[in-house]
Each structure stands twice: as structure tokens, then as C-alpha cells.
Amino acid sequence: MKILIISNHAYPAQGPRAFRTTELSEQLARMGHEVVLYTVLGKYDYAQYEKETGIQMRDIKPRFATSANDGTQRYNLFDKFMFHYFHRLLMWPQCEFHFIMDRIIKENPNMDVLITIAYPHSIHSGAARAKKKYPEIFPKTWICDCGDPFMLNPFFHSPKYMKRYEDMWCSMCDYIAVPTKESYKGYYQQYWKKIKVIPQGFDFSKTPVAEYKKNDVPTFLFMGSIYPGVRDPHSFMDYLLKFDKPYKFIMMMRTPLEERYVKESNGQIEYITGKGRKDVVWECSKADFLINVKNPSSVQTPSKLIDYGIAGRPVLDVENDFPDPTSFLKFYEGDYSGEHKIDFLDNYRIEHVAQQFLDLV
């Protein structure tokens, strides 16, 4: 089959949507399908990557300040002005994708399958716009893949007028792929019949783990994104500053939190930034246990739980306000009986995930 995939980010970019795009594209190509992947390439040389994977890499070519796979991003005075005043109102600069999809569909007529991957959701709405304009050349089956909801996202409130764009792509696509059963709640009920649960997929063979050895000092690790007041470890970290026993708490993220935690803990709290997913999982597998700051929303499940499952170390759930240290103290002493069980890890194998997409065609 000829498969067209459109996503903001892919290899070598880091992040859940980049991983989703990369793993899915590579697996579909391994299965013998012709895969054309449009993403924001930047200046990265994909010649060797195309040769190794068989994927045809194409550039979305946005004109404005959307970040590229290689981490580059135009951000001049005009971009700063537009982002400051119009990011919330227009979803600037990602709104540009809405108008680029026409060209991509015209460049790739009569494909068997189209998979559009959000964030941003303007990729979906742009594809809907292209389907209206060019129905005769539009791909036979269209799957909208959504890691997070849009209009009903509890973490981000979009302008009400954008509901018309969500209605447009939800009504025109064939399927909406979401990562968990709970994700249904992030979409308007009239579209639930289109929703298919397809979890995040990973090639486990590319993710080595260490042979665990108990650390001299109890060592626990957190990885992932932080949303102040929502998915927020500050209360837990404040507790650690007063904890009078030796420990090592490693936080792996894109950007560090306040340096005061490092200083006031005498280095017992440590930040590690800029590591790729493979390195992060390796570090997780060496920790005594892992910290999961619980997500108060049931419509979003942190993809880091999959990485935690691959790492194979016990997982401690921590509330935002950290009201009771009892569970932490048990983990500290090596009692992991209350761990967060990550079951059915095989469901996340990319071979199974890619087949679930193909089963929709």
C-alpha cells in the first residue's frame, strides 16, 4: 500500500509525537509498504536515514516559526510579536499547517492511506480542507491520530470558535486513533463511533536496559514533562529538602526546574537534560524505583509510563500536593508492594500497533 503520513516532528526530534511518527513510519516500511513522511525537516541530512529505513522523507516547508526536527527554529521579531499576541487566539504559528495540506495532497494523489498526527491539530483541519477541495485525489482511508484532545483538553483551553475546525476534521475523517480507552472523554460524543484505541508503539529492540544492581544510596528517578499545578513535583521535592536520610533523586527533562533544589539538597536532587529517549530509559533501568506524578486528567496518559514499563523498575505514584509520605517511605525502605503495575506491555510493541492501523484499511 501507499501510505502518506503527515506530522510536525519525527526523527531525530524527541517527544511523544515524534516517537509515534518515527516508530510507526519505520515499522510500516519494514512491513513492505511505500511510506511517504511529511514533517518539518530542518537542515538534517536524511540521505542515510532514507536508505536504511526505506521511508521517503518530505518537507512540510512552513514559512514561520515552527520548530524543526533538528531543533532549529526561526524566531525573529515578527515571530515574537505574532506568538505573543496571537498564539492563543490563532494557535500561531501552528495554524499555518491548516493551509499547507492542500499542496501535500496534490503532490501525493490517490494514496491508499493518510495518517495525520497531532499535535498540532491544524494538520487534521488542513487535511479536511484538502479533502473538501480535492475529493477525487484524496487518500482512500484517512486516520487522524491524536495523542491529546483539542477542544476538550483539560490542560489547554482553545478559543470556542475553533470547535468548527474540530467538527470539520472529526466529521470528515474515517477514524480517530487515541492512545487509551479513557481518551474518549476528550472528544465530542457524536464522534465516539469513529474512535479506535491504538496505544503508543515502540521498537523494544532499540531500547536496551541495564542489569539492575541495588544502589548504595536509595536512588529514584522522574522523567517527563512538568505542568505547574497540574503534573507538578514541587510538593514532593519540598518534602525531600526536609528528608533527613540519604537519597538521590534524578530528574530527567528538557529544561531544569529551580536550581535552589540542587543547592538546598546538597546535590541529592540532580537535573539531567538533553538526553534522548534511549538514554533516558537506560538511566531509568538503573534506578531503585521511579516516580510518576499522577495525571489528574483521565483523558491523557503520560507516555513515560511505557518507558517506565520497559525500564522494568517499580513505579511510585505521587500526588501533586503530596499529602502523605507513607508510600514513599515504604519504597525508600525497599517495600514496593504498592507499586503502579504497568500491565500488557506487549500491547505497546510497534509490530502490534502498526498492524492495528492497517486493520482499519
Predicted ranges, named:
Residues 253, 258-281:
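Nucleotide-activated donor-binding/catalytic signature segment of Leloir-type glycosyltransferases, i.e.
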Residues 169-195:
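A short, active-site helix/loop in glycosyltransferases that binds the activated sugar's phosphate group
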Residues 23-24, 122-125, 132-133, 144, ...:
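Membrane-proximal helix-turn-helix segments that form the acceptor-binding/catalytic region
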Residues 1-61, 109, 175, 240-244:
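N-terminal subdomain of nucleotide-sugar transferases
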Residues 182, 200-201:
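Carbohydrate-associated surface elements
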Residues 330-361:
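A charged, aromatic-enriched C-terminal amphipathic alpha-helix characteristic of glycosyltransferases
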Residues 213-230, 237, 353:
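Conserved donor-binding/catalytic core segment of Leloir-type glycosyltransferases
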Residues 138-143, 150-168, 204, 230:
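Nucleotide-sugar donor phosphate/pyrophosphate-binding loop at the beta->alpha transition
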